[in-house]
Regions:
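Conserved ABC transporter NBD signature motif
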Residues: 48-56
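H-loop (His-switch) and adjacent beta-strand-loop-beta switch element
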Residues: 206-211
């Protein structure tokens, strides 16, 4: 290492049981996002191992881990392609981990499924499949991102302060949707938040990190 090198995370020993909804809270610089980035494969780890459902993913590149992990970021613009239609974004999410050809057409059964899932949001988007994602509000886009991240029922759902950029009312709606989807699919979830009230309200486990 170098003289300016700083250890971001050390001595982390975390085990999540299937269906655990674990909230993580801590101040700036505590390593919350670093923890999620390490699990997702964005940052390599120097020692130890990361296992998802008995599969060692420690050396697995980020794009391969995406098969097991769903993730929603803080920025509502990150999780969706703004220049593509709602239906095209949903197709990409539906076919994650599969070979994508040049055909964008989807089956009637897929369209019915998309409408059914979008109806859960209560935003009227089930009738706007051809709308361009970039024309939607931040809350609408984040709701769709959450839907996309949970569509294939990932082994692990990572939520990186996914309501921090939203206004209070929209943030509450997205949190309620999160709770509903996690419960519906019994998803093992790790959610970072700065809000102690939210950390206590949601999930069955709470982790506090300090810098």
């Amino acid at each position: 290492g170098t003289i300016n090198e700083k250890t971001a995370l050390q001595g982390i020993n975390l085990r999540l049981e299937e269906g655990d909804f674990c909230t993580v809270i801590g101040g700036n610089g505590a390593g919350k996002s670093t923890l999620l980035n390490s699990i997702a494969g964005v940052f390599p780890v120097d020692e130890g191992s990361i296992t998802i459902n008995e599969i060692d993913v420690t050396k697995m590149p980020e794009y391969k881990r995406a098969k097991y992990i769903g993730r929603v970021f803080q920025d509502p613009m990150v999780g969706t392609a703004g220049n593509m239609q709602i239906e095209e974004n949903l197709i990409l999410a539906m076919r994650r981990g599969k070979r994508l050809g040049l055909k964008w057409a989807f089956k009637d059964s897929e369209q019915a499924f998309f409408k059914e899932r979008l109806a859960l949001l209560g935003l009227g988007l089930e009738d706007r499949l051809s709308a361009r994602m970039g024309l939607l509000s931040g809350g609408q886009r984040q709701s769709i991102t959450l839907l996309m991240a949970t569509m294939l029922r990932p082994e692990l759902l990572l939520l990186d302060e996914h309501t921090a950029a939203l206004d209070p009312k929209t943030a509450e709606n997205v949190l309620q949707l999160t709770d509903k989807l996690v419960a519906e699919h019994n998803l093992t979830t790790l959610m970072i938040t700065h809000n102690m009230r939210d950390a206590l309200r949601f999930g069955n486990r709470l982790i506090m990190m300090d810098a």
